[in-house]
UniProtKB/Swiss-Prot annotation:
This is Transmembrane protein 80. It comes from Homo sapiens (Human). It is a multi-pass membrane protein. InterPro entries: Uncharacterised_TM-17. Its main location: membrane. It comes from the Eukaryota. Keywords: Cell projection, Membrane, Transmembrane, Transmembrane helix. GO terms for biological process: non-motile cilium assembly.
Length: 143
């Protein structure tokens, strides 16, 4: 994946194109995930007897996840494009946190619809792929 740069030095480009593509795909998918999950929480609170304290908890966790996801994608993109290990490592740590929150929406909600399951499982798969590529990119940057 490293291509020689033209110009003054003989340095190589170490940024991961597949990782950058996954960051872009994950950002787009998360925007849809956020809206769909917000609508499903609203639907569950109106149609089913969804406990109020769980409704507040799920909404708070969804908005926390949105903030963490935005920071994660920013740090990951910045670390990948500048070939810096620290922002990419911070993004990797935030990936673990957002994966845990995604697992909450997949397994531990008071009421999990099949659409919740499908959306959260897809998001977890994206996070898993990104984590693997982030580890590979960090290893390439530290050589």
């Amino acid at each position: 994946m490293a291509a020689p740069r033209r110009g003054r030095g003989s340095s190589t480009v170490l940024s991961s194109v597949p990782l950058q593509m996954l960051f872009y795909l994950s950002g787009t998918y998360y925007a849809l995930y956020f809206l769909a999950t917000l609508l499903m929480i609203t639907y569950k609170s109106q149609v089913f007897s969804y406990p109020h304290r769980y409704l507040v908890l799920d909404l708070a966790l969804l908005f926390l996840m949105g903030i963490l996801e935005a920071v994660r994608l920013y740090l990951g993109t910045r670390g990948n494009l500048t070939e810096a290990e620290r922002p990419l490592a911070a993004s990797l740590a935030l990936t673990a946190g957002t994966a845990l929150l995604s697992a909450h929406f997949l397994l531990w909600q008071a009421l999990v619809l099949w659409a919740d399951w499908a959306l959260s499982a897809t998001l977890l798969a994206l996070h898993g792929l990104e984590a693997v590529l982030q580890v590979v990119a960090i290893a390439a940057f530290t050589r």
